């Protein structure tokens, strides 16, 4: 019998892509899965379910995934929040996390529970918001010391909905990617596949356009960390060793102050055109003088800082 999961895993390994797997703690169809606040109209007869049976089922599935599909980069859990109106409910996560790390010690564990990280988790997830923001009302938790990730969807839905054509613009997607990098976070961008398994044409178009931008500016994103300058209304910074990439996203001026007190700037150039950018040291940092008000989706200035 064909296994689409196995075919996907094999192709990822062939292409050098780390395979991360989404795993829902919620199941709206198994009769042993306890009812939460969602999925109550799916025909399950017993609201209490049979937790021991369901927990064993989940762990058996996870064991299969972590045993038969090669190296797995991460297990990305979702659904803890389904029991948030039942404070006494115990998902028994420590045992599940320990099992994952025992089967594959290098496999990361993340959980989209909208809380501060629990023991045994390796990444902190923020849903539909950048770390430290809470515009969608799902990510009010404090930022931890763990590696960060923000997940967002390209239109309005996580799954496919034919009437949802409100896809984010290429500019919006690039800005979200850049801001995530500037906040030291990975970006997980969701696309709901069509019933036939194909990705929507407009989503592929957006991916191609972001890809074209990344061909030029990828070095300012891949392998960088959030820069030594905190995010500002004008944009963010990313950094690799002594190179600071200033991502100017919203600026209605030709001058930009960079709070680089105590740091010596050796030179500044436009990242794409490599043309010198004038600067001068001033109180508290450095002032950049751009040739014109930026109109690019992301005007990137490369600043060389003396170590």
Identify the meaning behind each predicted range:
Residues 1-307:
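Mature catalytic domains of secreted/periplasmic carbohydrate-active enzymes
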